[in-house]
Amino acid sequence: MKYTQYPNSSKLKRNSDRREHDEKLSDELHNQSTIYEDEELSRAEYDSDSDSSVEDSTDNENSGKEMDEKSYEKNEDHVEDHRKRKKSKIQLLDIAEFKKENLADLDYQIGNSESKVEKGVNIEPFNIDDEIKHGVFDKDGNYIKTENATENDQQDNEEWMNDVINTEEVNRLEKEQSVKTQNSRHYMVHEALNLLKFFLVDENETVLESLGRLNKLRKIAISKKNKSLKYVIHGIELLSDLINILEKKGFSEVYEYNRLKVQDAIEEEIFDDSSRIVNHKTKLWGFKWLNKLDEYHGLYTNYEMSYWQKSYFKNSVIVKFHSEPDRDENWIHVSCLSFM
C-alpha cells in the first residue's frame, strides 16, 4: 500500500519541529540568564557587605566615607539594573525572524486559497508591516497597541471625514458652476453688439455713461422701494455681460463706444441682410406689466416699443429680448433701454 506524502505537510512538520526546538532553546537561555542575574545580584550584595566591613576598619574616616558612598552607588546600580531586567515581562517578537520563517508558508497559502471575496465581503489581508506601526507583538504573538495608536486612528478618521466633506463641497461647487454655465449668456458678436446698442439712449452716450445712468436708476428704486429694483439690476448685469463678451472677442475700449461706433461695428460683422434689424419690421421684444407678471405680451418691433415707452408704459413694464429664455433674470426694466 502506497502512502502519498504532501510537500506542504512535511514542510509544516519541519517548521513545527523547528519552532519546538527554538522554544526549548529559548527556555534554556532564559533559565541560564535568570541564574546568571541572581548570581550577579548576590555578588553585588556580598561586595557591598565586604566593602562596608573594610571601610569600618579603616583609620581614615574621610576616605572610608568616600569608599562607602562609591560602593553603595555601585551596589544600587547593580540592583536597579537587575530590577529593570526582571520588570521587562514583554519579550518582543523578532519580526525579521517571523517573516523569514513564515514567508514561504504564506506564499503557499495565498497561492492555493480561493478568492478573497466571499459573499460580496472583501477580506483584507494581514499586513504585519502596517500593524507594527501602531503596536508591537510579544514573544507569543499577542498584539499590544502602543499609546499613540488610538491617536493615530482618530487622526485617520478625521482625515477621512475631511476627505468626505471636501468631496461633497467639490461636488456642490461643480453643480453650481454647471448651473451657472448653463445659465450664462452666449452671443454671436453681432448679437452682442445689437443688444449693446439698445442700452445707449442717444448717439453720444458711451457704454461707461450708460452704466452710470443705470446705477442712478438703481439708487432711485432703492430709495422708493420700487418693484422695478430687481429688473434694473438685471439690466446692469446684462450690460456687464455684453461688455465682457465683446472684450473676450477682441474688442478694445468697449467702455468708450457710443451708438455710432457700435453701429459701425455691427455693419462690419453682418454678412447678409437676414441678420440686419429693421426697426419697423423685425419683431424683437416681449413685455409684462409689473402688476401682472403672469401675463406675457409680444412680440413687437423697435418702433412699437419706442412709441409705447414714451406714451403708454410709464415705466411700469419689464421687457425681454426675443432670443432670451423666459427666465426671471432675463427680464429688464424698460427704463434701462432705448429702442430707437
Swiss-Prot record:
Present with 799 molecules/cell in log phase SD medium. Disulfide bonds: none annotated. Residues 47-59 have a biased composition (Acidic residues). SUPFAM superfamilies: GYF domain. It is found in: Nucleus. One of its GO terms (biological process) is mRNA splicing, via spliceosome. Belongs to the LIN1 family. SMART domains: GYF. InterPro entries: CD2BP2/Lin1, GYF, GYF-like_dom_sf. This is Protein LIN1. GO terms for cellular component: chromatin; nucleus; spliceosomal complex; U5 snRNP. Keywords: Nucleus. Residues 282-340 form the GYF domain. Its main location: nucleus. Interacts with the cohesin subunit IRR1. Interacts with PRP8, HEX3, NFI1, WSS1, RFC1 and YJL149W. Gene3D superfamilies: 3.30.1490.40. Residues 1-86 are annotated as: Disordered. Residues 1-10 have a biased composition (Polar residues). It comes from the Eukaryota. Residues 14-30, 62-82 have a biased composition (Basic and acidic residues).
